[in-house]
Amino acid sequence: MAGSQIKIPLPKPPDSDSQRLNAFPIIMAQEGKGRLLRQIRLRKILSGDPSDQQITFVNTYGFIRATPETSEFISESSPQKVTPVVTACMLSFGAGPVLEDPQHMLKALDQTDIRVRKTASDKEQILFEINRIPNLFRHHQISADHLIQASSDKYVKSPAKLIAGVNYIYCVTFLSVTVCSASLKFRVARPLLAARSRLVRAVQMEVLLRVTCKKDSQMAKSMLNDPEGEGCIASVWFHLCNLCKGRNKLRSYDENYFASKCRKMNLTVSIGDMWGPTILVHAGGHIPTTAKPFFNSRGWVCHPIHQSSPSLAKTLWSSGCEIKAASAILQGSDYASLAKTDDIIYSKIKVDKDAANYKGVSWSPFRKSASMSNL
């Protein structure tokens, strides 16, 4: 079995708004009991290259409700029927051109008609039927998708509450808009992330997030206590890349060798809201040949948290967080090698001071630009 871990400590990067994502505040409509105001939050994450085209990622948070039943006769004075909330939900509208008017975006949500159905294959799934979206988002990715199929545990807070025989509708309440450089839009293909080989060593990334929550809250029971007393600590792992196994028998492939590789890559980590809460990694230096498929031509890669830890991602829908630290871990790629070797840890990963905070929904924007009733 593997022995103890070898760790290379590093001072924590200075605190900054770039290391956090804040939650949407709870704001109730004055004229309606129990109604939340629609809100929008805006943020910019740019690559630093002035020639890089800007795009917007639109991500939505809201609630699934049963579709209201209609009566035989309806008059103009009939009150609008609103069914109780069943559970919370997230759905990404994807990338598209830059959008300018926040107030217009909120008003346009009234034109949205998205139905929700539950199904199953080898596991439970959710099917979003896109009947109508606002014309404002016609150039975003969602406009090309009439049906969106997804794992229920990644996009629905409590999928067990959705039952057969009921028609459901998704009501958008919170709109998260991230203006970013087009070069940031890169994810590694899942088959490449899942592949393991005895010919390479795997480089994993651990990101420690300080989640905003009370010590006695239910979510705190599934996380570590924060020694600084500012919340709770959650660890999330991603497969970052592979490194070719060195065959020079006269060379020692230890923590010094690994630290040299990571130092030359000049890794920086940040957080944003793109496909939901997302970890962004940038390699600003030399990328080894075996690692190049895991980054785009400008050294960027995005890792949506819901792909690695759906439960943590759903926690961040309603809680803000801050990147506390990040480390790269060298392991054997195939399971036989992994079981027989120590983890070598490189903790000198930079945290981008301009993009290391996540402001979730406490249900608080990066910046609250406008709000209106969720009719």
Curated annotation (Swiss-Prot):
The keyword ATP-binding does not apply. Belongs to the morbillivirus/respirovirus/rubulavirus M protein family. One of its GO terms (biological process) is virion assembly. It is found in: Virion. Keywords: Viral matrix protein, Virion. Pfam families: Matrix_Paramyxo_C (PF23765), Matrix_Paramyxo_N (PF00661). This is Matrix protein. GO terms for molecular function: structural constituent of virion. The M protein has a crucial role in virus assembly and interacts with the RNP complex as well as with the viral membrane. GO terms for cellular component: virion component. It comes from the Viruses.
